[in-house]
């Protein structure tokens, strides 16, 4: 079956919904959202805890409530969507191959495409934990789905490896459901989650967090029987004699998220090795003109509100591209300096910036009383004081047109400096 659309959006989660609604509001009528699951909303449907929407709606919502607000807008604007539909591939000339049980094999021609596929969890295999291979080992997201959607309890005595936000939230969720969470072990000397989640999910329930610890052995024949954790040195190697043994039936893994870019790579889109997502410009456009990306497929966000904000930018940019309103120009590269892990966007053109440019970034380690500075030719054009920064919390800085006007090179450098410098 052959089809033609102005805009095709791959992924019907929070990023795809926000992008679709914004593109429609900017004059694009012929839009198709493709979602591989049986319902729209993405991961939010299983995030039944509150804490969503504080930035976007100025009120606290659960995940399904947040998703429903955008779904209602999608329905109101009569934006077409296909569920249970798998995208098989995308070509450089913006032809999408997809398949489902109703329409069969589809070839969809698009004037523009937005990639909003989100991210996936790292598994046990990805981090090579030693030990037996019994039942009772889950990623935190899989456990969340079992409990919140399928209605299955995953275990009674639980150890969690990794202190990402999903792991922290599941520590609380399991406790509320009657399980005993014995410990959360984190390989790094700092938590990978938001401080508010550490307080609300661990401290409030007296769940111990062991920093610089990892799982060194899993023991169990049919089901997990014991998990052994140990302290690690600065080279992340276990220190003999520091082992702690837990009798438990379940191990949850919250060991990082990876942007879902198999399709992006196959299409030939350039990927940033630091984010594992596409390299994007000021319009959230990838290395292939007319193909945009936003949300967790680009870089992992802390809050869904920020995913929505970024995706609205992608939706508006795709509308501009379709209408021929994008101006080409010389790219200015955003390079990372001391302490910065990555920035998004990685490059920009002055011609397409309306008011200001927002840079999202993560730092490599914990910093206190420092400044984020932006330099052009070693000259500081912008600086922001920061009392506390951690890799688990995304930082944002806004560069105004006035600041951008001071750039006199084809690159800027973003770095962390001590306060007195």
Residues of each region from the PLM?
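A Rossmann-like FAD-binding core segment of flavoenzymes
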Residues: 69, 74-91, 96-98, 175-262, ...
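FAD-binding core/adjacent interface of flavoenzyme oxidoreductases
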Residues: 1-10, 68-157, 233-241, 252, ...
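Beta1-alpha1 glycine-rich phosphate/pyrophosphate-binding loop at the start
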Residues: 5-69, 73, 145, 154-200
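Predominantly flavin-linked oxidoreductase catalytic cores and closely associated redox partners
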Residues: 105-106, 115-209, 214-223, 290, ...
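Exposed aromatic-hydrophobic patches
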Residues: 360, 392-403
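Short, aromatic- and glycine-rich surface loops/edge beta-strands on solvent-exposed regions
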Residues: 372-374, 402-421
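FAD-site-proximal beta/loop scaffold in flavoenzymes
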Residues: 115, 137-147, 250-301
């Amino acid at each position: 079956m052959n089809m033609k659309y102005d805009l095709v959006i791959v992924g019907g989660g929070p990023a795809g919904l926000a992008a679709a609604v914004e593109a429609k509001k900017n004059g694009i009528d012929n839009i198709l959202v493709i979602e591989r699951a049986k319902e729209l909303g993405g991961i939010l449907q299983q995030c039944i805890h509150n804490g969503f929407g504080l930035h976007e709606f100025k009120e606290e919502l659960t995940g399904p409530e947040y998703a429903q607000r955008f779904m209602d807008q999608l329905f109101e604007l009569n934006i077409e969507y296909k569920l249970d539909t798998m995208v098989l591939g995308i070509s450089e000339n913006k032809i999408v191959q997809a398949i489902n049980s109703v329409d069969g094999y589809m070839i969809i021609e698009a004037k523009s495409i937005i990639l909003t596929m989100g991210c996936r969890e790292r598994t046990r295999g990805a981090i090579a934990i030693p030990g037996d291979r019994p039942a009772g080992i889950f990623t935190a997201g899989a456990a969340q789905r079992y409990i919140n959607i399928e209605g299955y309890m995953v275990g009674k005595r639980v150890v969690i490896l990794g202190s990402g936000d999903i792991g922290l939230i599941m520590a609380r969720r399991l406790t509320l459901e009657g399980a005993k969470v014995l410990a959360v072990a984190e390989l790094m000397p700092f938590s990978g989650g938001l401080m508010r989640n550490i307080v609300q999910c661990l401290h409030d329930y007296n769940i111990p967090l062991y920093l610089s610890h990892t799982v060194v052995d899993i023991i169990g024949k049919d089901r997990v029987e014991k998990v052994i954790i140990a302290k690690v040195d600065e080279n992340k190697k276990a220190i003999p004699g520091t082992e702690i043994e837990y009798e438990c039936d379940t191990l949850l893994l919250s060991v990082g998220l990876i942007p879902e870019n198999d399709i992006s790579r196959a299409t030939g889109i350039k990927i940033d090795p630091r984010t594992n997502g596409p390299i994007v410009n000021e319009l959230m456009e990838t290395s292939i003109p007319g193909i945009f990306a936003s949300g967790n497929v680009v870089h992992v966000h802390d809050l869904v509100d920020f995913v929505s904000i970024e995706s609205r930018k992608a939706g508006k940019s795709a509308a501009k591209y379709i209408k021929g309103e994008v101006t080409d120009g010389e790219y200015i590269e955003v390079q990372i300096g001391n302490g910065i892990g990555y920035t998004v966007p990685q490059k920009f053109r002055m011609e397409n910036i309306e008011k200001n440019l927002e840079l999202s970034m993560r730092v490599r380690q914990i910093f206190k009383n420092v400044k984020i500075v932006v330099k052009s030719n070693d000259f500081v054009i912008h600086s922001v004081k920061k009392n506390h920064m951690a890799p688990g919390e995304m930082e944002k800085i806004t560069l105004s047109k006035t600041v951008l006007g001071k750039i006199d090179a084809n690159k800027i450098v973003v770095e962390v400096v001590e306060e007195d410098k």
